[in-house]
């Protein structure tokens, strides 16, 4: 089974399990690390995820994967919180984390309101409207980035 198919199937199974526990699937990684495959689930819930939550999901999801048995390669299952630099994956994330500092990387060069052309932006998330993410950049100007041009977006931790 191709990696994309594994990720799609794991996503469906994980979302079903997690919704019953009032948790959400933030992201999935399925990749080779050294000679082994690693299936990594990043999960969260309102109020934050605990180590016990991760252990519970790991046990229960491991049982589901053993029953479904669709991953042909040997792999290691890891369940983790998304961490301080949580990725923004869904449109709802851009509303949920409004006002927070984010780092956005784009596929193509995007111009901010001052005419600066770049692919990496750091600023406070103003929100998402009409398929466009708005950031108030650290330099003071605004940037409007089409969601379709975003390669990666993460919360940034401020010290």
UniProtKB/Swiss-Prot annotation:
Function: Required for maturation of 30S ribosomal subunits.
Compartment(s) where it occurs, according to its Swiss-Prot or TrEMBL record: Cytoplasm
UniProt entry keywords in alphabetical sequence: Cytoplasm, Ribosome biogenesis
Domain of life assignment: Bacteria
Protein's GO biological process: ribosomal small subunit assembly; translation
SUPFAM superfamilies cross-referenced by the UniProt entry: YhbC-like, C-terminal domain, YhbC-like, N-terminal domain
Sequence similarity: Belongs to the RimP family.
Chief localization: cytoplasm
Source species of the chain: Geobacter metallireducens (strain ATCC 53774 / DSM 7210 / GS-15)
Gene assigned in the entry: rimP
Protein name stated in the entry: Ribosome maturation factor RimP
GO cellular component, one term: cytosol
Record Gene3D superfamilies: Ribosome maturation factor RimP, C-terminal domain, RimP-like superfamily, N-terminal
PANTHER family the UniProt entry points to: RIBOSOME MATURATION FACTOR RIMP
